[in-house]
From Swiss-Prot:
Its biological purpose: Catalyzes the reduction of the glycolytic intermediate dihydroxyacetone phosphate (DHAP) to sn-glycerol 3-phosphate (G3P), the key precursor for phospholipid synthesis.
Record-listed NADPH binding positions: S13, W14, K108, A143, R258, V282, E284
NCBIfam families for this protein: PRK00094.1-2, PRK00094.1-3, PRK00094.1-4
TM ranges: none
Pathway annotation from the record: Membrane lipid metabolism; glycerophospholipid metabolism
Gene3D superfamilies documented for this protein: N-(1-d-carboxylethyl)-l-norvaline Dehydrogenase, domain 2, NAD(P)-binding Rossmann-like Domain
Superkingdom per UniProt: Bacteria
EC number: 1.1.1.94
Name recorded for this polypeptide: Glycerol-3-phosphate dehydrogenase [NAD(P)+]
GO MF entries: glycerol-3-phosphate dehydrogenase [NAD(P)+] activity; NAD binding
Binding-site list for sn-glycerol 3-phosphate: K108, G139, S141, K194, D247, S257, R258, N259
Keywords: Cytoplasm, Lipid biosynthesis, Lipid metabolism, NAD, NADP, Nucleotide-binding, Oxidoreductase, Phospholipid biosynthesis, Phospholipid metabolism
GO cellular component: cytosol
C-alpha cells in the first residue's frame, strides 16, 4: 500500500487511536493539538497518558501545534474534536486549506442552536471547492479498545461511495474492519442520539435497576432515534446497522462510555454540574439532549425517553419519578410505521 499522509485534528482519545491505526497501516498520521503538554508527550514519549493511559504509540505518530504543518500534503483530514468546537475549528481549517481534500469527521452530536448535524456544520464553514468529499466515520467503538488493537468495526458513510472506499482502504486492517454506506444522515443521527440513550442506561444502572430495564430502554430508545431519523431523511435500515443499533449497544453497556458513566453518577444522586466537573471530558449526550429536545418538539416527534432524560438533566426531575412516569404512559401497540 502506498504511504499517505493523513492529518488528524484533535489530540483526544479518538484522534490518537485513529492515528495509531494509520501508523499500523504504514501511513503518516500527524495529529494537530492545541496543548503543548500533549503534543510534546506524543512526540517525545510516544504516549498520550491523559486520554489513552498505558498505550504506547508507534513512533510514526507525530503531533504538532501548527494546523498548517498538520494538513500540508495530507490526502485526508480527519476532524476528531468535540462538537462544541466544530465551527471554530472548521473556520480555521477553511482558511488553512490550499487545495481540495477528503474530509472525514468522527464527531457525534447535534448543534443545539441550529439542530444541524456535524456534516452540515462543516459544509457551512468549509468552502465546497476545498472539499473533495465529506465522509462520516462512525460505529460501535471505544478509542481505548481500538488503541489496544481489539477487533472493531466501523462504517464510512458518504454520498460519494468512491470517497468512502478511499477512507475504507486507509483505515482497514486485521483489527479494524470498515464497511461503506451512503446514508450520511442516518449515520450521524444514530451516532449522536445514542449518547442520549446511553445517559439513560447509566441512570438506570445508577438507580439499581437490572438488565430488563436497560434492555427496554435501549429498544424503545432506538425506536425514538429511528423515528426522528426517518423524519429528517434517513433510511430506516441504517438504524439496524453499525451506526445505529451497533453504536447504541456499545455505548449503553460499557464502562468506557463517558455518557454511561455520567448517567450512572446522575442515577446515584449527583447533579449535572458535579458530574461534568468529575468527568473532566466532554459528555456529548448532554449537549445533544438539549438540541434534540427542541428539535423533536418542532417536528412533533414523540420521544418520551429523550424528553425524560432532558428533564433529569436540565429541569431537576427526580430520576425515579421520571421512570415511573414512563412506565405509566398510556398503553400502545409496539409496531412502528415509517
Amino acid at each position: 500500500m502506498t504511504q499517505k499522509k493523513v492529518a488528524i485534528l484533535g489530540a483526544g482519545s479518538w484522534g490518537t487511536g485513529l492515528a495509531l491505526v494509520l501508523a499500523d497501516n504504514n501511513h503518516k498520521p500527524v495529529i494537530w493539538g492545541n496543548l503543548d503538554k500533549i503534543v510534546n508527550e506524543i512526540n517525545e514519549s510516544h504516549t498520550n497518558s491523559h486520554y489513552l493511559p498505558d498505550i504506547i504509540l508507534p513512533t510514526e505518530v507525530k503531533a504538532t501545534l501548527s494546523l498548517d504543518e498538520a494538513i500540508d500534503g495530507a490526502e485526508i483530514v480527519v476532524i476528531a474534536i468535540p462538537t462544541n468546537a466544530m465551527r471554530v475549528v472548521c473556520k480555521q481549517l477553511n482558511e488553512a486549506l490550499k487545495e481540495p481534500t477528503i474530509l472525514v469527521h468522527v464527531s457525534k452530536g447535534i448543534e443545539p442552536e441550529t439542530n444541524l448535524r456535524m456534516s452540515e456544520v462543516i459544509e457551512e464553514e468549509i468552502d465546497a471547492k476545498k472539499r473533495n468529499a465529506l465522509v462520516v466515520l462512525s460505529g460501535p467503538s471505544h478509542a481505548e479498545e481500538v488503541a489496544l488493537r481489539h477487533p472493531t468495526t466501523l462504517c464510512a458513510s458518504c454520498k460519494d461511495l468512491k470517497a468512502a472506499e478511499v477512507v475504507q482502504d486507509r483505515f482497514i486492517n486485521n483489527n479494524l474492519r470498515i464497511y461503506t454506506n451512503d446514508d450520511v444522515i442516518g449515520a450521524e443521527i444514530g451516532g449522536a442520539l445514542k449518547n442520549i440513550i446511553a445517559l439513560g442506561a447509566g441512570i438506570s444502572d445508577g438507580l439499581g435497576y437490572g438488565d430488563n430495564a436497560k434492555a427496554a430502554l435501549m429498544t424503545r430508545g432506538m425506536a425514538e432515534i429511528t423515528r426522528l431519523g426517518v423524519a429528517v431523511g434517513s433510511n430506516p435500515q441504517t438504524f439496524y446497522g453499525l451506526t445505529g443499533i451497533g453504536d447504541l449497544i456499545v455505548t449503553c453497556t460499557s464502562v468506557h462510555s463517558r455518557n454511561w458513566r455520567a448517567g450512572n453518577m446522575l442515577g446515584k444522586g449527583e447533579n449535572l454540574d458535579e458530574v461534568l466537573e468529575k468527568m473532566g471530558m466532554v459528555v456529548e449526550g448532554v449537549r445533544t439532549a438539549k438540541a434534540v429536545h427542541g428539535w423533536a418538539n418542532k417536528l412533533d416527534i414523540d420521544m418520551p425517553i429523550t424528553e425524560s432524560i432532558y428533564a433529569i438533566l436540565f429541569e431537576n426531575k427526580d430520576a425515579r419519578e421520571a421512570v415511573d412516569l414512563l412506565m405509566g404512559r398510556k398503553k400502545k401497540i409496539e409496531k412502528e410505521s415509517f
